[in-house]
């Protein structure tokens, strides 16, 4: 029986859903970071449980032809790019396979063609948002990412998947914090001032927002810092302070103060303008979000007479992108601030046929149904946990001709598709989309039609 710190030669047979290598030894399934199928490795045993175990690569005896050496192992250790060691074409294949496996194993569906994953021409430096912790490492204030499953900061200058101008602003701000001797947050001692830097950048507008997350309100010499930042980065339109004095993993506290400029920035997506606040949910990969939303619109095959329900509507990015092509859009979102943003975004784009409510999707559906609203298409974009049974039942009771499902988790999508099929809807096509290159995450669009 293998035990901790034993070293054994193994061959990696597959990848897990989150990109770990899988090896089978003595009836145990081992999960090994930074190991790819067909690779032969010397593996150190880290932990053994009842049926599964964890190992690490001690050395490679034979490497995969699909291993990418563009990335240092540090990026894998932080989880920034947990698939960055796999060539990009194979990443896309892996993501398609995740969707196929989920549909087959969870929904029992294997007769639907899952299209090749839509990918990026340049699958790095794509993120329009960064959330970076500030800590002391070896006596110096540093910015970077935490190592996986820990709160030990790994200092980073090039974040690989973030917009390069965002990286430059983070490094510049870090240097100013050092220069002005502002103390980084110490989680253990609950001391220090600067907890996090959050940066957002409009992909098309170039407008930048910087949020300083602090433990208290006073920031020494903040006016001089702001002056230097806007002199070096004229695209910075908003500098905000957020105060978070709680012992929590949540990045933001409840209090926001605008220190410079506006409290929002703007960007465009599929031709519409959007106002983005520090807390707004806005897809972090603009180019691929446009492909995702356009795929959902194409699948829905909308007509000028259609009434569409946009469930989980956020700040309106999906519904507003097709509103001018249909009769009416009814949007529901549980976060009230997002609904207010959606209404502002509709006004900003002179769109008058959208109707938003702040409520649970289930309650909104019941209310619309009572009012006699009959949707032709229901478009859903739920969080990772997927849809509730009650939502699925309420949506099918309205008898739309199509349900277009945007998913960020193939397993919960497959579970939901199974219930939709039991209630008289048929899955007809699925398109995976790579919103998060270099990571194991995959989004997809699925079309269900009334049988």
UniProtKB/Swiss-Prot annotation:
Domain TRAM residue range list: 1-59
E.C. code: 2.1.1.-
Binding site for S-adenosyl-L-methionine: 283, 312, 333, 381
BP GO annotations: rRNA base methylation
GO molecular function: rRNA (uridine-C5-)-methyltransferase activity
The entry's keywords: Methyltransferase, S-adenosyl-L-methionine, Transferase
Catalytic residues (UniProt): 408 (nucleophile)
NCBIfam families, A to Z: rumA
Protein family (similarity comment): Belongs to the class I-like SAM-binding methyltransferase superfamily. RNA M5U methyltransferase family.
Listed name of the protein: Uncharacterized RNA methyltransferase SMU_788
Organism in which the protein naturally occurs: Streptococcus mutans serotype c (strain ATCC 700610 / UA159)
Taxonomic lineage of the native organism: Bacteria, Bacillati, Bacillota, Bacilli, Lactobacillales
